[in-house]
A protein has these predicted regions:
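Phosphate/pyrophosphate- and phosphate-bearing ligand-binding catalytic cores of soluble enzymes
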Residues: 3-5, 10-17, 56, 151-309, ...
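His/Asp/Glu-rich mid-to-C-terminal helical/loop segments that flank catalytic regions of hydrolases
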Residues: 307-322
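Short amphipathic alpha-helices in soluble, non-transmembrane regions
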Residues: 36-40, 193-197, 314-318
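Anion-binding (especially nucleotide phosphate/pyrophosphate-binding) glycine-rich loop
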Residues: 1-148
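Short glycine-/small-residue-rich flexible loop motifs, especially phosphate/cofactor-binding loops
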Residues: 37, 98, 198, 274, ...
């Protein structure tokens, strides 16, 4: 195991803060992962598994071992005339994997094009966009169970997928995802009615959309709405859309008729976090070199702050003002370390 000391984490997370890992290593096999974990445990060092770093904010030095997940590869497990089963390494770049599938005309993930991150992070957050959740297309997940200290294969049902959540998020730090099995279709049911996809296809004169044309439309939409983290430091949506009860919704809609919300079931509503933030007076605000991306109140960007704590302070001010005005708790959509 190659062990590095006092490594800057700036190149390894998209917020690009000048935080330090006291110890750092990368792993590209299951055996290397176990070796790194055993070393950390035997030396009483806390450890953190780091993927692409697009969903994390480091706010201080990490006094332990950062293990960079670099297990990659796309393997065909099974194929029929109508579908294909793939196994993909957790360290594989998500956008690269989706592009690979789109080029083969394998359907299912095209609506999830251009989402930053790694394949291993996809089931953890159950990433979703434009009417599609990744959990719909996951057959199983291979992971290391840090409690039982053994490799496990977790089926789709046992992954307990929900809105941007899963068993991996609920039982935090228990499972280390190493590979994901996907089932994709050669005769996919295309989803074109969600978001601006239908509008883009219409503008392009596309009457009979394909996997490729939908992916292209999604890439166009996301490129116009979301900042490229290689150019502007950010981690995408910083907040989740909060859930409230029907009673809370009835109370709020009387006070704020323009409230943006939609029902989840007979008892629950989801509120647009961006609307709450803008209505609390944060649109266009920049403080200490931290602010929002254009008109996206969900996306906090780091213009030039060197410390992650500055970004965290900014987000906490937003949360507090939303709570005071609306009585609604915003939750961070990213990991805070």
């Amino acid at each position: 195991m190659k062990l590095q000391k006092n490594i800057s984490l700036k190149p390894y997370h998209s917020f690009a803060c000048e935080e330090i890992a006291s110890l750092f290593t990368s792993v590209d096999t299951k055996d290397a992962l176990i070796e790194a974990i055993d070393w950390a445990n035997n030396n009483n060092q806390p450890y953190l598994i780091l993927g692409s770093g697009t969903n994390i904010l480091f706010t201080k030095q990490f006094n332990g071992l950062v293990i960079k997940m670099e297990i990659t590869g796309i393997q065909k497990l099974q194929e029929t005339s109508s579908e294909i089963l793939l196994q993909v390494g957790a360290g594989e770049n998500w956008t690269h994997f989706v592009s690979y599938c789109v080029q083969k005309s394998w359907g299912g993930l095209e609506n999830l094009s251009l989402i930053p991150g790694s394949v291993g992070a996809a089931p953890i957050k159950n990433i979703s966009a434009y009417g599609v959740e990744v959990g719909e297309h996951i057959v199983s997940v291979d992971a290391f169970d840090t409690i039982k200290k053994q490799w496990v294969t977790i089926t789709q049902q046992d992954c307990a997928f929900g809105y941007r959540t899963s068993i991996f998020k609920k039982e935090v730090n228990r499972y280390i995802v190493c590979a994901v099995q996907f089932k994709l279709s050669k005769q996919p049911l295309l989803r074109t009615d969600f978001g601006a996809i239908k509008s883009v296809l219409h503008d392009r004169g596309i009457i009979n959309p394909s996997v490729e044309s939908i992916a292209s439309a999604v890439i166009n939409i996301r490129s116009n709405q979301w900042p490229d983290s290689k150019k502007i430091a950010n981690a995408g949506s910083f907040f989740n859309n909060p859930s409230i009860t029907t009673t809370q919704f009835d109370h709020l809609i009387l006070q704020f008729p323009s409230l943006k919300a939609y029902p989840i079931d007979d008892h629950t509503y989801k509120i647009d976090a961006g609307w709450l933030i803008e209505a609390s007076g944060w649109k266009g605000v920049t403080k200490n070199h931290v602010g929002f991306y254009q008109d996206q109140a969900m996306v906090i960007v780091n213009y030039s702050a060197t410390k992650g704590q500055t970004i965290l302070n900014f987000s906490e001010e937003i949360m507090q003002s939303v709570l005071i005005k609306f009585g609604v708790n915003l939750e961070s959509a990213i990991s805070i370390v």
